[in-house]
Amino acid sequence: MKKLIFAGILAATGLAATANAQIQKGNWLVGSKLISSNFGLNTGGGYNIAIQPQGAYFIQDNVAVGGYVDLGINKVTNGSPTEFTYGVGGLGRYYLSPGEKGVDNLLHHGRWFLEGNVGIGGRSVENADSTTGLDFGAGPGYSYFITPNIGLEGLVKYKGRAGFGSEGLNSNITFNLGFSIYLPTSKAKEVANDVRN
């Protein structure tokens, strides 16, 4: 029984420590968010699907900077014009430490974070005006580590686009689900070498 309790304590300590190892200076974050996805179930129902691949480098512990690409397609109902959305820009993330005031770690297997982005994006509507503008967004999220290097993420984010043309500010609040792979620098170099060979 003592061995079982000791093994449990070691496992819990190891899992708690893995929530910090991923977000250290020099590591890489690669992942994607499924921005929104819905399909109309009624006759003539529409759909909205978007994906956001992203990559970032930890410039210091708990702080990552990188870039993203936004791609999406939207059709409100059958017969309505199809809308294609796109964007590219920079992003930043700050992971909250469990010791910071007001921060509690859910099950000790993940981390809360704040994410912000700025870039250029737009939309192209079938047989209608298209626009390009300044994309921006910010919001809190949580990364739950299912393994030491893979996190499932949820993010509530305010997203806005200030059009450069006749279109003004468009904004909404999105709920994002996705995943991220956290690679130590040595592992990232191995992957890059494997791709070259």
Language model features: what each stretch is:
Residues 57-136:
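Gram-negative (and chloroplast) outer-membrane scaffold detector with strong preference
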Residues 39-49, 76-83, 125-133, 163-170:
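Solvent-exposed loop/turn segments connecting transmembrane beta-strands
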Residues 1-25:
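Bacterial Sec-dependent N-terminal signal peptides
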Residues 88-97, 170-197:
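Outer-membrane beta-barrel "beta-signal"
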Residues 20-57, 64-65, 178-187, 196-197:
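Short glycine/proline- and aromatic-enriched beta-strand/turn motifs that initiate or cap beta-hairpins
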Residues 22-27, 62, 97-112, 146-150, ...:
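Short loop/turn motifs that connect adjacent beta-strands in outer-membrane beta-barrel proteins
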